[in-house]
Amino acid sequence: MKSYIEPFIASKALSQNSQKAYRYDLQQFCQLVGERVNQDKLLLYQNSIANLSLSAKKRKLSTANQFLYYLYQIKYLNSYFRLTDTMKVMRTEKQQAAIINTDIFYQKTPFVWGQLISLLILELGLTPSEVAGIEVANLDLSFQMLTLKTKKGVRVLPLSQILIPFLEQQLVGKEVYLFEHRGIPFSRQWFFNHLKTFVRSIGYEGLTAQKLREQFILKEKLAGKSIIELSDILGLKSPVTLEKYYKS
């Protein structure tokens, strides 16, 4: 996030002294908040300036809010965060998610690992950890089924015909896991990097595993699945987290 400080300052008509003040405040802000903005980190920043004078607080809040809005505008942040004068953190979500056209996800690409990860999430609603845990022995392409074994239990998921060729391609030479190196599953960071590279290559930068899973949820709901049915498909203990998608 620090790398955006200078472009942000350059986007504003500021005097030299104001530029120095902005730069100083934002460097402090980024040092405390880090690269990922969330409510807890903003509250940490709030506490760090709690004992300053009223004028200093207002200046730092104003600078931080302008920077947060800038990051939201350039789509570095998916949600708009704002610190208020009353020292409360307000978080405004974007519009409710809409179904996107996913045709491009199935087109030929050099980023085959990231493509398959994204398709398994889109087609089956899997989490990254569930994708990482897919074992070769539990994939039955003849009957188009995946038996998914997790700590929460066992789920048998149907595989669509369109997904089969992508799986066949990656199954060659695998010993234990679908995603592995000599029988050892890849790290969480490996999955994150490959997914990020693929979605960026097709023009969907910023589309996370969570958002891809949300696409599965939206499509299943549109197809007529009840909240209980969808909860079972996803392996959830309770349908509570799905309630927001079923509100009228």
Swiss-Prot record:
Provide the Core-binding (CB) domain boundaries. 1-72
Tell me the ranges covered by the Tyr recombinase domain, including all copies: 85-248
The record ties this protein, via Gene3D superfamilies, to: 1.10.150.130, Intergrase catalytic core
GO MF term list:
DNA binding; tyrosine-based site-specific recombinase activity
| Active-site residues annotated for this sequence | K149, R213, Y245 (o-(3'-phospho-dna)-tyrosine intermediate)
What processes in GO biological process is this protein linked to?
A: DNA transposition
Which UniProt key words apply to this protein? Cytoplasm, DNA integration, DNA recombination, DNA-binding
> Record's InterPro entries?
CB, DNA_brk_join_enz, Integrase-like_cat_sf, Integrase_catalytic, Integrase_recombinase_N, Tyrosine_recombinase_XerD-like
Please give an example of a GO cellular component term from this record. cytoplasm
Q: What is its main location?
A: cytoplasm
Q: Where in the cell is it found?
A: Cytoplasm
Q: What does this protein do?
A: Putative tyrosine recombinase. Not involved in the cutting and rejoining of the recombining DNA molecules on dif(SL) site.
Q: Tell me its family.
A: Belongs to the 'phage' integrase family. XerD-like subfamily.
Q: Which HAMAP family match?
A: Recomb_XerD_like
Entry-linked NCBIfam families: PRK02436.1 (NF002685)
What is the official name of this protein in its record? Tyrosine recombinase XerD-like
Lineage summary = Bacteria, Bacillati, Bacillota, Bacilli, Lactobacillales
